[in-house]
Regions:
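Gly/Gly-Pro-rich "capping" loops immediately C-terminal to redox-active cysteine motifs
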Residues: 157-180
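SH3/SH3-like beta-barrel superfamily modules
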Residues: 54-127
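C-terminal capping alpha-helices of c-type cytochrome domains
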Residues: 180-205
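Short, Lys/Arg-enriched N-terminal segments with co-localized hydrophobic residues
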Residues: 3-14
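Sec-dependent N-terminal signal peptides
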Residues: 18-27
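Beta-loop motif signature
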Residues: 33-63, 67-68, 132-134
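The canonical Cys-X-X-Cys-His
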Residues: 148-159, 190
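Electrostatic cytochrome c docking/interface patches
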Residues: 121-145
């Protein structure tokens, strides 16, 4: 019984931690921020032809400067100490903002060290193709919501986005996406939408 109570208290604290970090992340969803609705390759500099990772859809970026067809961007988020090559959207939730190849020369700076189980607050600066950005993330969420409802409610009752937590949604969607009309290029747009409107994050509330 004591173990059950302790487990419940831990899960409650973890839920609060994710919600609080999501609120902080939501603050980035404001003026001056840009978003993409597709996966973008990221590069170490303005001229490199070799990608070092990927920027995933609907994550806020600050465009620092442009050079030719490239833009230098800054992305802020959280770093799980056990996964050094990924910047996550929220503390404790595996919502990927930027994922670097493990062998790539990436640079993730720690802004604030996490304590008592919290993840580090971090930022990274990379280059991407400058096209395809928009300040209207809600339009991207609406597009993803439409695809989810039209494609995933055909064979069975459509689960509410809040029926699962952020960490559960990627594998759940991937298990059924082959039976839907969702195109490969839109897969991560829908996943990020579901994660950011899940039971423990839910930007839509």
């Amino acid at each position: 019984m004591n173990d059950f109570i302790l487990k419940g208290e831990f899960e409650g604290r973890n839920m609060k931690k994710i919600i609080l970090s999501a609120i902080v992340a939501c603050a980035a969803f404001g003026a001056g921020m840009n978003y993409t609705d597709v996966v973008k390759d990221v590069y170490a500099d303005a001229n490199s032809a070799k990608s070092i990772g990927r920027l995933l859809p609907t994550n806020a970026v600050e465009i620092l400067q442009t050079s030719g067809d490239r833009a230098q961007i800054k992305v802020k988020g959280y770093q799980n100490p056990a996964v050094s090559n990924v910047v996550y959207f929220a503390d404790g939730a595996r919502i990927i903002s930027v994922a670097f190849a493990k062998t790539a020369p990436f640079d993730i700076k720690v802004i604030k060290e996490g304590k008592n189980g919290k993840w580090n607050e971090v930022e990274t600066t990379v280059f991407v193709q400058k096209d395809g950005f928009s300040t209207d993330v809600n339009a991207m969420f609406a597009k993803a919501d439409k695809m989810y409802k039209e494609s995933c409610g055909v064979c069975h009752a459509l689960p509410q986005t809040t029926h699962f937590n952020a960490n559960q949604w990627p594998s759940l969607l991937k298990s059924m996406i082959g039976r839907t009309a969702i195109e490969k290029k839109d897969e991560w747009l829908v996943i990020e939408y579901l994660q950011k409107h899940s039971s423990d994050v839910n930007l839509g509330k």
